[in-house]
């Protein structure tokens, strides 16, 4: 069996739902190379037929059955896509019938509801959270009074992408603070962070992985040297331990998992947008 499998994320909207679920599923299987492609706004029969032909062409090119993660709400479009002969993983079909029976009502197909601008208040909260994350990135903010979360870590340990994810998907006002040499000379929290202890969450990372990331940013620099990475990570972990700050390693942890851990640890109840 070929270890290369073409995968298509097909949606009548942006494709975020299909890609998120598909990625979560595929990460459970090692030893394969998944060649992925997004097909978005497939919202009529003509577009569905074109998509089906492209999927069929991929099966001929790779000589293996493609995988389709489908989030189209119109079942007719799903039938057309299935004509490609691909393995169809329908995001909604297994659950719609169960919900219709339980709620004693028929569904109303609404394209893009999962990630669309459902109402202005929700959209406004998301944008404000995003602006907050950018304004409070890398310790540039004068105050953290309005922050709901403050991620603390050495440089390039995953603070910024996690803050942005929390803002976009949960509307969380997330700030981050980079630990610099001056901070790492002590096992105590930096003075700026001490008033916000209950908002802090520490991120750590394998030094070898940190070196790889820093090497891409500043090749062959002292900043990217392995001994620098080891020293900074060890000092940060000593501080987190001494101050009893909950920590999580980002080395083999997805942003989704990190974000979920942060929300649970800090007791933030927020629905995903």
Curated annotation (Swiss-Prot):
Signal peptide: none annotated. ADP binds at residues 153-160. It comes from the Bacteria. It catalyses: [pyruvate, water dikinase] + ADP = [pyruvate, water dikinase]-phosphate + AMP + H(+); [pyruvate, water dikinase]-phosphate + phosphate + H(+) = [pyruvate, water dikinase] + diphosphate. InterPro entries: Kinase-pyrophosphorylase (IPR005177), PSRP (IPR026530). Transmembrane segments: none annotated. Its EC number is 2.7.11.33, 2.7.4.28. It is an enzyme of class 2 (transferase). Keywords: Kinase, Nucleotide-binding, Serine/threonine-protein kinase, Transferase. GO terms for molecular function: ADP binding; ATP binding; phosphotransferase activity, phosphate group as acceptor; protein serine/threonine kinase activity. Bifunctional serine/threonine kinase and phosphorylase involved in the regulation of the phosphoenolpyruvate synthase (PEPS) by catalyzing its phosphorylation/dephosphorylation. Belongs to the pyruvate, phosphate/water dikinase regulatory protein family. PSRP subfamily. This is Putative phosphoenolpyruvate synthase regulatory protein. The lineage of its organism: Bacteria, Pseudomonadati, Pseudomonadota, Gammaproteobacteria, Lysobacterales.
């Amino acid at each position: 069996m070929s270890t290369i499998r073409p995968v298509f994320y097909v949606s009548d909207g942006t494709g975020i739902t299909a890609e998120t679920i598909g990625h979560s599923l595929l990460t459970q299987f090692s030893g394969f190379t998944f060649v992925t492609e997004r097909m978005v706004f497939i919202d009529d029969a003509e577009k569905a037929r074109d998509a089906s032909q492209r999927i069929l062409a991929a099966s001929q090119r790779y000589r293996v059955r493609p995988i389709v993660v489908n989030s189209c709400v119109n079942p007719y479009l799903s039938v057309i896509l299935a004509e490609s002969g691909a393995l169809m993983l329908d995001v909604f079909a297994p659950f719609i019938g169960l919900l219709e029976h339980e709620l004693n009502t028929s569904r109303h197909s609404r394209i893009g509801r999962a990630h669309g601008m459902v109402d202005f208040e929700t959209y406004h909260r998301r944008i404000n959270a995003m602006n907050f994350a950018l304004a409070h990135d890398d310790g540039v903010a004068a105050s953290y009074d309005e922050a709901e979360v403050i991620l603390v870590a050495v440089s390039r340990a995953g603070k910024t992408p996690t803050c942005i994810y929390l803002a976009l998907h949960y509307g969380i006002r997330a700030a981050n603070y980079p630990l610099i040499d001056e901070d790492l000379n002590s096992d105590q929290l930096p003075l700026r962070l001490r008033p916000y202890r209950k908002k802090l969450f520490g991120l750590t990372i394998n030094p070898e992985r940190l070196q790889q990331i820093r090497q891409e940013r500043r090749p062959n620099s002292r900043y990217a040297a392995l001994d620098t990475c080891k020293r900074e990570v060890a000092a940060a972990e000593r501080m987190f331990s001494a101050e009893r700050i909950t920590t999580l390693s980002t080395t083999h942890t997805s942003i989704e998992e990190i974000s979920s851990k942060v929300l649970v640890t800090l007791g933030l109840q927020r629905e995903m947008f």
